[in-house]
């Protein structure tokens, strides 16, 4: 009842501050401005996206029949695809996640691509839907509990990854109980003999990719220093980076590509960029991974090394940044591969290693979300466009 009383009071205050009664007509004009077509034959005015040049209006767009034809074409395509019943068993599974890619982001992204009429590749899929998201204990979800949901099919508590709702955030003892662990799609795929991999533009120990292989009571426990800072015991509750290298699921991953070198290195060691490691246990997890996987397994740190891998590569660990990979607009083209390039290399390796049994690949465009968090709209939208390229 209190909430219903507050709304008119706030509205009244806004009117008083303005010093005059709100003009409905003026407000309507501001919200829905009308533009003149202008005299230039090649000009085309679009809605509120400055500094972007759009293609001239197509002649056929002037006619109602053009738009009606598009509608009929779309309807025919959908009907045809639904009439052909697909009874084939899927061989390869690729899960693409655009973290932070809301409907408004898609709308702005289409304009960024060239106009409202543009479409992302995934918008042309035969089936498109929406899902509601929430954690077991919170209405507004984070990337941790949702990773457990879409990768394991289980609702979890806010801030936890790969564990059931029996584990509260930072509860080390509960994390240590195998009965609370939630298996991921990658675990199921490995049980079927399939090749598996993960790709992200964030750190490979971040919440979303961690749902593939980790079971943790705190998404921030990406290295042992973070576990200790929360009065946890790393020997009882291994950090996420340690789980990636030493857990049964992490050890079997054929492809691991993203950022996050600092979480794998001791604080006494600096990576290739000069950034110090974060670990307090003195372990170099990169070297541990290399000792586990010899012969045709490779560790790479640059785009050149990734694209130069031999056709005999069976496994690859690629860490291209101290933490998250740079935004595409800020990246060094020689040092940092694009998401599209990482996907292509991963598919080649997984196809070879699947031995005909198929593969599972998780792909995250994770920095869309970061751009929105930091109000970097252009970068969020450009990351969306880059994500779209990886899906095509």
Which role does the model predict for each range below?
Residues 3-20:
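Cleavable N-terminal signal peptides of Sec/SRP-targeted secreted and luminal proteins
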Residues 272, 276, 331-340:
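Short, polar loop/linker segments at the starts of domains and inter-domain junctions
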Residues 207-214, 323-333, 357-358, 362-390:
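Active-site His/acidic residue clusters
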Residues 335-356:
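Long hydrophobic segments that form regular secondary structure
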Residues 17-314, 322-323, 385-388:
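N-terminal catalytic scaffold of extracellular/periplasmic and nuclease hydrolases
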Residues 297-301, 354-360:
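Flexible, glycine/charged-enriched surface loops at secondary-structure junctions
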Residues 342-346, 387-392:
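Short, well-ordered amphipathic alpha-helical segments that serve as non-catalytic structural scaffolds
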